[in-house]
Amino acid sequence: MLKTVETVDDVVEFFHWLSTHDRVAVDTETTGKNVYEFNFGVRLIQVGDTHSAWVFNFKRWRGVIEEFFTRFKGEFIFHNANYDIHALHREGIEVPWRQ
């Protein structure tokens, strides 16, 4: 299932889905590779598991994305953690570190 988040109902459905998981994959899509460029930005963020993916427009759903990183107490799996976490940090989103 691929779900593009477009409505508040989609957000509610996402958080319900998230509550059933203890581990999720996270990926970002950005405007380029260089996080130090003046016009660099995150465009999309995807959250998923082996069967489902949720796609968020970063600018539109920024508050929901911040809430996701604050509320979710499970494990984040990043394809390229160094880059994605740096890109999110550049946008003011802190990814919590857990041991």
Language-model-derived ranges and their functions:
Residues 1-99:
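Conserved RNase H-like, two-metal-ion catalytic cores of nucleic-acid enzymes
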